[in-house]
Amino acid sequence: MDEYYQVHNINEAINALTDESKPFPPALLYTFSDLNADDIRILKAAWPSLPLMRRRTLLEDLIDMAERDNLMMFEEVGKIALEDEDADVLVSAIDLLFQAEDSRLIPTFLRLLQNASLNERVRAAAANALGPYVYLGEVEKIRPELLQNIVEVLLNIYANDLSDLVRRRVLESLGYSSHAAVPELLRAAYFRPEVAWQESAMFAMGKSADDQWQSFVLANLEHE
């Protein structure tokens, strides 16, 4: 009976998403938490045919709900949405997965970041999502070779990419890294004239375990 109830609910939610003539019932948002294998299969098959605005607003609503209730687990929806082609959907999917701490997501985030044909907001979101995995690598919670791969890609993107937004998000994620190249990158960004770069440098310094940045952070706080 429980299995039928779950399948019935996911189908009800999908039908409600498909019917744009009626508002989507907020109570059905709970259906997308803790999806079982059948739910995942059904939603994945239906996802491409869901109206674009419904896909966008669904993810936005799930992000809001997850922020208000940490018992809600929408990671499987986020993983399905990572295969979407819409930039807004992709950004929201990445945001929904930001705290997943699932190393299986690393290749996908790296692929999105390195795809120069994608919207820069998608690539910036992917760069941002890699930050927690740099931290996990530094505290030895993921394999060293995974950390090395992430940092090498981030450094390469930072050195060669044309998007300032992407490069700033890369710098912020590199703040967690103990790589020898990072301190000079942070220092150079901090002394750039653009406020956005200064803010990214400060954000990265705040993530760093390197004590040399303490004076920079304190000076900025006093200035504010």
Predicted regions mapped to residue ranges:
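Short N-terminal helix-initiation segments at or just after the protein's N-terminus
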Residues: 1-7, 21-27, 74, 95-99, ...
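Alpha-solenoid HEAT/Armadillo-like helical repeat scaffolds in large eukaryotic proteins
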Residues: 16, 42-50, 77-85, 108-118, ...
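Core helices of alpha-solenoid repeat scaffolds
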Residues: 36-40, 71-75, 105-106, 143-151, ...
